[in-house]
A protein has these predicted regions:
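Beta-propeller blade termini
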Residues: 56-66, 101, 122-137, 148-151, ...
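Hydrophobic beta-strand segments that make up the repeating blades of beta-propeller
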Residues: 69-76, 134-143, 189-193, 260, ...
Length: 541
């Protein structure tokens, strides 16, 4: 019987503490200018006047040059004849998406022109995955108009293959998530499409400071594309069972909500029921949102759901969901065969009810082992700024507002939209990147999160060429057991760090690290030292 080939790579990123009593709470420091980020988001016009402009944009975190440091890709709107007012025409040709390479010293360099990824459309979101299994992560940009797929050439440049690939969806796409839905070893993609915007619809019925909402326009169906393995993709939306012509999708994530080893899809829709597509095997899905009580929150009606995020909030071994919205937000706790709305019971409704939430992120910002929550807020219909939210999980079923203690960033208001998480400086704590509508983004360095111990895990497929999207990682340290599914697409219009970060608190090692691979096989490691990046490559069968 042949031996299993297992590759484990330990990378010591930063020295952790020897001992600490009760660590002070971390703060987030605005390093945007110091980091050399000169990007500014634009709605492609001078005045916010419609739902296309108001939807905003996200940000992508990915390591495009395989140097072990996370790079940033920012997307922007641009003047569009079907969207923008005539006086914004002077912006035509002056706006583009921007790619920033991480210089390893806290700064970034704009390499957009050399890379060839400025794009040509009104962009809303971006995602990344190694679509051809060549070891280099590729770039997919979601647009109002044809989407754009850029293949990574491995030399710092990209080649656009949008039309040839079959992924140049002409509809209004907001977000995409990559995963292997059929288990063939190739990454497929689910694309969220929003609505059919018409510049002239109902304009006379709205006050000057407002504009028509999502129900004023027909919805558009999302799309699931199967990777054919030859550089092309096939639309399998209907045959896979994920067709919803009136969803008005705003966000998507992939998680194994029922612990059966298969990737399920959760889609958030605007003013409509959310969709929970249960993977029943054989490349088929069944919509079970209402049946599992995940279609609505406790209000029992569709709200303006934005980007979903997930984590095992209560350490019961089942992944929970949070959905920012225009109401109180919605925390759906996984009760194994259904979900329960615990937004009010956990204290989140009181904290979040006064804001319009867009980019929600579960992250353990203080590395104590429990999932905390950041929410980027901003008015939906005008450029009225709102407070960002940061709440700390107390480990006892409540969330505590800690924004006032978390740095100067939280003392100001913003018209925020997308957001992403990343360990940009490889120091063991998660930083934040927040996109502001028609303004500069904020890059926020986490200072102090690594006072507690931590472990970062990056599961890779056989051969170590690409991230094992869909793998589940379990980390046990002392009495605490944490789980996380490998899906970095878990925030509004954005994609975060592909590495999975686990806070260990005062534990100096993980007693057990388990990777359940997408094919169901498992790799188990014991007594893993803390404060390092652990790259685990799936063994050959």
């Amino acid at each position: 019987m042949p031996r299993l080939a297992l590759t484990v790579v330990f990378t010591l990123l930063a020295a952790g503490p020897l001992q600490a009593a009760e660590p002070a709470l971390p703060v987030f420091t605005d390093i945007t200018e110091k980091a050399g980020i000169r990007f500014k988001h634009s709605i492609g016009d001078f005045k916010l006047s419609n739902i296309v402009e108001g939807t905003g944009a996200g940000v992508l975190v990915f390591d495009f040059d395989n140097d072990g440091w996370m790079d940033l890709y920012f997307v922007t709107g641009r003047w569009h004849p079907d969207v923008s007012d005539n006086y914004g025409r002077q912006l035509r040709g002056k706006l583009s998406n921007r790619l920033y390479r991480n210089n390893h010293d806290g700064t970034f360099t704009d390499v957009t022109e050399r890379a060839g990824v400025g794009g040509h459309q009104f962009s809303c979101g971006a995602s990344a995955a190694d679509v051809n299994n060549d070891g280099f992560v590729d770039l997919y940009v979601l647009n109002y108009g044809p989407n754009e797929l850029f293949l990574n050439n491995g030399d710092g440049t990209f080649t656009e293959i949008s039309e040839k690939s079959g992924l140049a969806d002409p509809r209004w796409s907001l977000q995409a998530v990559w995963f292997d839905y059929d288990g063939d070893g190739l990454l497929d993609v689910y694309v969220v499409n929003y609505l059919e915007y018409d510049k002239g619809v109902f304009r006379a019925y709205y006050a000057a400071q407002n504009y028509p909402g999502p129900l004023s326009y027909p919805g558009q169906p999302d799309a699931l594309y199967r990777n054919n393995g030859n550089g092309t993709f096939t639309d399998v939306t209907k045959e896979a069972g994920v067709y919803n012509p009136e969803g008005r999708g705003m966000g998507v994530t992939v998680l194994d909500f029922d612990n059966d080893g298969l990737p399920d899809i959760y889609v958030t829709n605007d003013a409509m029921p959310n969709d929970l597509f249960h993977n029943t095997g054989g490349g088929k899905f069944k919509e079970e949102g209402l049946e599992r009580e995940a279609a609505f929150g406790e209000s029992g009606q569709g709200v303006s759901s934005m980007g979903p995020t997930f984590a095992d909030v209560d350490h019961d071994g089942w992944l929970d969901l949070y959905i920012p919205d225009m109401d109180y937000g919605c925390l759906l706790m996984n009760r194994h065969d259904h979900f329960e709305d615990r937004t009010t019971a956990t204290g989140l409704a009181v904290i979040c009810g006064q804001y319009t939430g867009w980019g929600g992120i579960f992250l353990d910002y203080d590395n104590d082992g429990s999932a905390d929550l950041f929410i980027a807020n901003g008015n939906a219909h005008n450029e009225y700024p709102e407070d960002p939210v940061l709440v700390r999980n107390d480990g006892q079923g409540r969330f505590i507002d800690v924004a006032a203690q978390s740095g100067d960033y939280f003392r100001a208001k913003y018209v925020a939209r997308g957001a992403a998480f990343a360990d940009l400086d490889n120091d063991g704590d998660l930083d934040l990147i927040v996109i502001n509508l028609n303004a500069a983004p904020k890059v926020l360095r986490n200072d102090g999160g690594n006072r507690n111990h931590w472990l970062a895990v990056r599961p890779m497929t056989v051969g170590g060429k690409r991230d094992a999207l869909g793998a589940r990682v379990t980390v046990a340290a002392g009495s605490m057991v944490q789980i996380m599914d490998n899906c970095p697409t878990r925030c509004y219009l954005s994609q975060g760090d592909p590495r999975l970060y686990f806070g260990l608190g005062q534990a100096k090692k993980a007693d057990r690290v388990e990777v359940r691979w997408p094919d169901g096989t498992k790799t188990v490691l014991a007594d893993v030292p803390a404060n390092r990046l652990l790259t685990i490559v799936q063994p050959n069968k």
